[in-house]
């Protein structure tokens, strides 16, 4: 078999078969093509998502190879990341050897095993081939001699937009010009907050609004405007016509649409998210593609037809030969002495053991090292014996990794028991705070709210509160109006300069004091009166979802949550539901530090609603009849864990029983110590601190109030595992704030439904968070959002670099990097550890096809710990 045919065969093996055109319908093609982008939520409700959620039917390896080929995006850790991790002891060499041996066993080759192993061992050092070798005349002459047959071996890459293949007379790529225009139109249409003048005809939809304006666009030439002058009024017809006139064959249409969606994945992701929010905009992605391809046609029409619209990349055998010379110790003289069959065998092997394969093995070794270290921590805890202490209070925290250190110190310093559960506490609600007409879905973005809960108070108190709020709103509105008005904007610097100048100086030099003063002033002015909730079911035809709960629903949600964490008996005198929130200043990514389980909002509202439900006599009576007996002196309260300063703020404390009051006083007494310990542990991870911190709480507050601080906290960086089991499994284990912790008692889950719900809900959210951090670390230029210091907040939607970039979809550099050269986040795929018998895991995988697919395709890793403490990797 010839060298080209062998390489072509290997290419087809590695090719990601993401395109399989079956339908002629453009609607179906757009839906299929949209899998290559992920919905992008507005930054104000920043929701974790992973960019490959539509591609999970393929393996992680296939998607990695496809992205490398189609967009030159590498989603495996870089060589520098791998070397750094190895130097820090995060990668055991033995696991790399196991991964290599497993890979070699899966391959078919006829050379001696020792030869293959020696080549791989050298290649795994991840050294670049010397440029002097690659450019040497002897090597290139050898490549020409070996390539004695027609080198028809091609990498059939995805079809690129025609505009990306053409440059104008100034040397500018037409795809860059097209992107500039599309960004401008997207900003105009999607703006919900920034512009004083809305886009004309916006209510008619993106395409129609664009069509009314495009022929007046001075940024287009007269010839380009002429092409679009009599363009169809229907977006679908326009898209079909553009594809036809661009000469895109039916078999290439989906690939072509994918190429355009991947050109600006941020803006396309925002468009896709908007299309999922309302019936009126459900065709928005079609409209976006119609606008984009119509404009592409206008820009490239003078250059049509092109001779070859499909990019074909030949596989160069020069680096393949060079790799055997450099890593396999096969000289040019030896190459010339080989037969064609032997040469083909070596080249095919080098082609298979490419850079992606090498990095894949390193990643697997890195992940296995982490899994083994976690197993040893859990095993050492199980071997130790601890006396069961009397518990005076039980506190339920969100599964968020930032809760783990706080819980650990809390349990160590006092007679407390903690639980982990998704921070929306199983309540599928949309919340409306006092004095607001807007509701916010306070649950994971993968779910839809079923109930609306309003915060209520006495009518007179409400009016007084609204008047106080209106004062602040009026000042902000006046400032914004003056800033955006043509005439008053020139006067604004004179009017506001002294005040804003004073704010700048004080915020910069004494941030903690000024921040505390402003926060206290705001708190005093906007002090909420005592409030209640609209908990009882009310049928309102003006609301899309019902207000409040029926009695059965109240009981059901409380029962479901208590069973999910295994808290159905042994209640302490005080049970505290702890939501969490963050505290930072001048931070566009503030929502990213809030509760992901509450849709990028604080979790206190849900915690308070749930605690209130648990205190209702009707709920307790119904639960008692089912065997869940909550003692009369047990009181449920609610608090909010402030993750930036590691403090617990009480938000709902009803009248307490005597024993509950004692527990409350106990928590209050030790909380300063808990905050000090948790803050010290967290702050020492920040790059600013290398020595002992005298006053951790004071420093934490400074970080929270400093408006120049680009890293008030690490957020969920370094997350690596999701442990589902009883607290005894990990109690007193220092998990370094890297684990999501969800309580689960398999003995109370005979049907397996509770475990299935944990995997489908919190498990999915944890996976999305994990892969968003992963993507922002390994490919920050494509999936991250760059440097916070140079970002521009755009249209109230997200951030850009400058004023004409893609809408940046991921996390900023400061969220994942320790410095310019050192990462902080370890890019590992999430390890899900379940404490349950083997048959529970088998049943879960058999019944949950989606989860089984994620495990098999390498999007998550799975391990279990059986009742005897035995660890099993799945």
Swiss-Prot record:
Keyword Zinc (UniProt): yes
Presence of the UniProt keyword Zinc in the record: yes
Location(s) in or outside the cell: Cell membrane
Membrane association type: Peripheral membrane protein
Binding site for Zn(2+): 398, 400, 580, 595
One function term, GO molecular function aspect: zinc ion binding
Pfam families linked to this entry: DabA (PF10070)
Disulfide bonds: none
GO cellular component: a single term: plasma membrane
Signal peptide boundaries: none
Keywords carried by this UniProt record: Cell membrane, Membrane, Metal-binding, Transport, Zinc
Database matches in InterPro entries: DabA
Cofactor requirement: Zn(2+)
Domain of life: Bacteria
Function: Part of an energy-coupled inorganic carbon pump. Expression of both dabA and dabB (DA2) restores growth in ambient air to E.coli deleted of its carbonic anhydrase genes (called CAfree, deletion of 'can' and 'cynT').
PANTHER family: INORGANIC CARBON TRANSPORTER SUBUNIT DABA-RELATED (PTHR38344:SF1), UPF0753 PROTEIN AQ_863 (PTHR38344)
Family the entry assigns: Belongs to the inorganic carbon transporter (TC 9.A.2) DabA family.
Assembly and binders: Forms a complex with DabB.
Name of the protein described by the UniProt record: Probable inorganic carbon transporter subunit DabA
Gene source species: Bacillus anthracis
Gene transcribed to yield this protein: dabA
